[in-house]
Amino acid sequence: MLKREMNIADYDAELWRAMEQEVVRQEEHIELIASENYTSPRVMQAQGSQLTNKYAEGYPGKRYYGGCEYVDIVEQLAIDRAKELFGADYANVQPHSGSQANFAVYTALLQPGDTILGMNLAHGGHLTHGSPVNLSGKLYNVVPYGIDEKGQIDYEDLAKQAQTHKPKMIIGGFSAFSGIVDWAKMREIADSIGAYLFVDMAHVAGLIAAGVYPNPVPHAHIVTTTTHKTLAGPRGGLILAKGGDEDLYKKLNSAVFPGGQGGPLMHVIAGKAVALKEAMEPEFKIYQQQVAKNAKAMVEVVLERGYKVVSGGTHNHLFLLDLVDKNLTGKEADAALGRANITVNKNSVPNDPKSPFVTSGVRIGTPAVTRRGFKEADVRELAGWICDVLDNINDEATIERTKKKVLDICARLPVYA
């Protein structure tokens, strides 16, 4: 018999110590990695529930195992909420991650060797959109598109490439692009050659749910997202579609299970259901509006301090500092800011002279700091601290002074009160 008082601390002190240290790190560091966020205690309650014990291969009402009557309710709640939140008429909540969701789309609609058009990773795309180091870049013939000298998607060039290469699929979406994508224009280009338009909205799903960023669901054939990042739910994936194409929906379902996965993670799906309900609350819209305001406020400060921002600004939750003119690498900036308890990630910039392991840029995002209560005044101050560190990257006194300021504001604005 398992006793409920069993705990990690008494059984595995070494593991528990590392877990506790991570809690302290999250509370005492300012998190600016654009893909990270803090999920609610309700979501964590779902993920730590007895649902983790249940195997449920198949879909609600069509399982291969018995005893699924209650997890069917859980999954159907998640499906219905996802459809309502994003205006879709199809949703699959089973993908274990955004990458798994993307590969389910590829499996459903492509054959190895088919041509796809995806945003260049160095211009803000994602590994799973055809990067040569990713399986998507090995299985398919990839034609990359990028951004112009103003940092915007060049739709005219995209249309020309589409006409030249006749891809079977055009991929929209990004991991480090701060502009607004014209989904209708992308669909127009896809339709002109009879291609699928597939949009990976993982980075902006929360903003889209709140009406702060344009929704691709009415325009794309298929949309995927993660359920963490701006959506602030558990780590996982989601596939959406609209248009009533039942044949497409069957292909997508089969590509997830049994095509790419076995049993779904029911405790995570419960967490997704909770997060999707939270995203329907008025407070969530206010939060996402603040995420965008905070990103713009930070950009204003770094530009005033003489730093270059790719695209010249931001229209979402992130921006990319281009450090080429500062003779700094992204790796150096990442490390120095880390010593000041400010967590960012090094990131390639367009036409980056450095390798992906070094880079010439830093990606900065505001979902996590906004989640803990930062407003415009707070992030303006924070942006100034970032510039102070980057201006004096080898001055440990500056880094220590900044770290003290970080600890003070983190104590004032905790993640979990």
UniProtKB/Swiss-Prot annotation:
One Gene Ontology MF term: pyridoxal phosphate binding
InterPro entries in UniProt: PyrdxlP-dep_Trfase, PyrdxlP-dep_Trfase_major, PyrdxlP-dep_Trfase_small, Ser_HO-MeTrfase, Ser_HO-MeTrfase-like, Ser_HO-MeTrfase_PLP_BS, SHMT-like_dom
Superkingdom of origin organism: Bacteria
Site feature location: Plays an important role in substrate specificity: 228
EC number: 2.1.2.1
First-listed, main subcellular location of the protein, grouped into a coarse class: cytoplasm
Function summary: Catalyzes the reversible interconversion of serine and glycine with tetrahydrofolate (THF) serving as the one-carbon carrier. This reaction serves as the major source of one-carbon groups required for the biosynthesis of purines, thymidylate, methionine, and other important biomolecules. Also exhibits THF-independent aldolase activity toward beta-hydroxyamino acids, producing glycine and aldehydes, via a retro-aldol mechanism.
Pathway participation: One-carbon metabolism; tetrahydrofolate interconversion; Amino-acid biosynthesis; glycine biosynthesis; glycine from L-serine: step 1/1
Key word Iron present: no
Keywords recorded for this protein, A-Z: Amino-acid biosynthesis, Cytoplasm, One-carbon metabolism, Pyridoxal phosphate, Transferase
Name of the protein in question: Serine hydroxymethyltransferase
EC top class named in words: transferase
Cofactor(s) listed: pyridoxal 5'-phosphate
Modified residues (N6-(pyridoxal phosphate)lysine): 229
NCBIfam families associated with the record: PRK00011.1
Catalytic activity, as annotated: (6R)-5,10-methylene-5,6,7,8-tetrahydrofolate + glycine + H2O = (6S)-5,6,7,8-tetrahydrofolate + L-serine
UniProt binding sites for (6S)-5,6,7,8-tetrahydrofolate: 121, 125-127, 355-357
Keyword Signal: no
Cellular compartments annotated: Cytoplasm
GO CC aspect terms: cytosol
Single Gene Ontology BP annotation: glycine biosynthetic process from serine
Family as reported in the entry's similarity comment: Belongs to the SHMT family.
Disulfide bonds: none
Classification via Pfam families: SHMT
Gene label: glyA
Subunit structure: Homodimer.
